[in-house]
Amino acid sequence: MINRLCKRLNQNIEVRQSLSSLRQEIKDSSKRELLLSWIHDGDLDLSVFLENEDAKTRKNAALLIGDLALSSESDAVFHAYQTEDTRFVKEAYLTALKSLNAAPYVDVFRKRYEELSLYEASDDEKKHVEHELHALSELINTIEPFKKHRFLGGRQTFHCIFRTNPLHPEITAALMEESSAASSKMGVRVKTNHLNRLLPIRTYNELLFQIPGMVSCKPDADVAASVIAGSNLMALLENTHEGDFPFYFRIGVKSHMALSERSKFAKKVASKLEELTAHKLRNSTSHYEFEIRMIEGKSGDYYLLVKLNTIVDRRFSYREEFIPTSIKPVNAALLVELAKDYMIPDAQILDPFCGVGTMLIERQKVVKGNTSYGIDHSPEAIKKAIYNTNLADQIVHYINKDCFTFTHDYPFDEIFTEMPYATGQKTEAEIREVYEKFFPFAKRVLGPEGTIIMYTRNREYVKQFAVKSNFRILKEIKITQRPESYLMILK
């Protein structure tokens, strides 16, 4: 197929379609190499099609050159961009140049961006001008990645939503010690002048901001952009960050619309917002500094929230290594907060299914233990646990073996663990067997007053097998609804 298409191009037969077909064919790496051999051997020159009288042919040729990353054609593509009169083709040249050597022309692109951002486009031109502006912005930042703004915070008043586990927002609210903190469906709402004091709390999933003047809007792209542009958003960005405009953003839409419709709607909002802010806010899907979340309500209107990616979350910076079944550190932190009244300071602690060490590390941050041991059958998990624990500046003794064969010279005070669960690697029957073995094992390694604090997705097995080894359930707390999971404390 590649040979046939190349011959057709050289014979000037259905050029536009042949270029388009080649773009599809080279998704296969072997076919890509075959096409490149035609070009490198001098048997095909794609640059000639940049001068074709048909605009769509020029567009397809530029995009194919970009797909192949033919840096040798950088000058030709740049020249074609500068001389192109058809607006919808100009975006294609810029897209191609992202994969080529466009650095020598960056000043030209900057000047073009400034000129185009001031240009009053007609209704017919508007869409294509917006596309070219967006492509210019992406290209400029590919050549010279922009310096991300640094969040300063300061004594501003922030209207925040700390998103949490939906069943336990009260845990995060209590840790805030803020009179305005109130639990809601989304987490904890709080109005605060002390944001920097709240950021280190370990039990929230993410932080969103409600911006005065942009609480909600009608389901219309122009209206949404007007509400956002007329709000306190620009002032907030300017007053809480080091550096000047522009700021880069993306729009996220959560609604009943199909994905393609959501994407179109988000692009319309973003484009209008760029226009209304004189391009002080610029849309980017790859290097954005903040997100505008548009969440459809029952009435059809949208609630508007902002996430600042300029706020660096260092709470779990130790957790660089993980495996597919690793518990999220924010979930481990929540388990610790829920169970801390049952944890003994200076205890001897064991996690027999330790994975990459997250449970033990998070426990130590809240209730200091004496000696901690982690066991896992996976050499990879143990290696990663050691790495993470060193980053956390903690000491845990890790052992790579089947925990049920583990013996120790003295008893432990506590087992704190996330129990295994059925996955593609473990069947339900195997999980049942783990629980059947676990409680006799726990009885053997724990002292007479020993405690089990476990996170489980198999509550029924706990109830079935715990009693056989004389363990009684002191407390059970539902952690997630779907799938059902529980924190269970036994003695």
Protein language model features and the residues they cover:
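Short coil turns that connect the paired helices of HEAT/ARM alpha-solenoid repeats
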Residues: 8-14, 48-56, 82-88, 115-120
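S-adenosylmethionine
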Residues: 398-483
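Amphipathic alpha-helical scaffolding segments comprising HEAT/armadillo-like alpha-solenoid repeats
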Residues: 1-9, 35-49, 70-82, 103-115, ...
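Conserved SAM-binding loop and adjacent beta-strand
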Residues: 319-336
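Non-catalytic nucleic-acid substrate-recognition regions in nucleic-acid-modifying enzymes
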Residues: 82, 98, 113-276
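Structural detector for internal amphipathic alpha-helices that build alpha-solenoid repeat scaffolds
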Residues: 15-37, 59-68, 91-100, 127-136
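Conserved S-adenosyl-L-methionine
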Residues: 332-410
